[in-house]
Regions:
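Generic serine detector
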Residues: 4, 19, 35, 55-58, ...
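Polar/charged alpha-helical tracts
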Residues: 1, 28-35, 94, 138-142, ...
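Generic, low-specificity signal for short hydrophobic/alpha-helical stretches with a mild N-terminal bias
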Residues: 11-15, 26, 70, 90-91, ...
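Active-site/acyl-donor-binding loops of N-acyltransferases
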Residues: 47, 98-157
Length: 157
């Protein structure tokens, strides 16, 4: 694992793009996370086998969190963030796991002066999925349609 590249990609996203107030993880941190803390690193590589995106994965029972990620921000046309999460979702699906997505991030950002912005996640069942899956998604659609932006903001979203 190219720890220097992973550290650099993390820095591009969390430090350069967002804020130098974020944790400044080092190569040693990433090495310890994998070798001592049991985390894994999912990496996307380009045609030259160079890491262009990564996500650090913490897996507890059937729930996965991503405590750190990074990608090459110098080439926005590649959509590396979307590719990284597509690869992550594909792996989670194969493992039968759930992703704890942005847990607590809203409160964390508000305390640092962030402006609340709603995030959306699209759920779509494949056309060939069974009636039970289709039915569950229809139920979720009905329940979700009752949740308004105003309610979400009142709940602290």
């Amino acid at each position: 694992m190219e720890l220097s590249r992973i550290e650099a990609l993390y820095g591009q996203v969390y430090l350069e793009k967002h804020s130098y107030l974020n944790p400044q993880y080092t190569q040693k941190f990433f090495d310890d996370a994998v070798s001592l803390m049991g985390m894994r690193c999912l990496c996307l590589v380009d045609t030259l086998d160079r890491i262009v995106a990564f996500s650090l994965i913490s897996h507890k029972q059937r729930v996965v969190t991503v405590p750190a990620l990074g990608y090459d921000t110098h080439d926005a046309e590649q959509g590396l963030y979307r590719h990284l999460f597509a690869a992550l979702y594909q792996e989670l699906s194969a493992l039968g796991c759930w992703l704890n997505y942005s847990s607590g991030a809203g409160d964390f950002k508000r305390k640092r002066g962030g402006v609340p912005t709603l995030e959306y996640t699209l759920l779509r069942a494949p056309a060939h999925s069974g009636w039970m899956t289709q039915g569950m998604l229809k139920l979720m659609e009905r329940l979700g349609s009752k949740v308004t932006v105003e309610r979400m903001m009142a709940w602290g979203a």
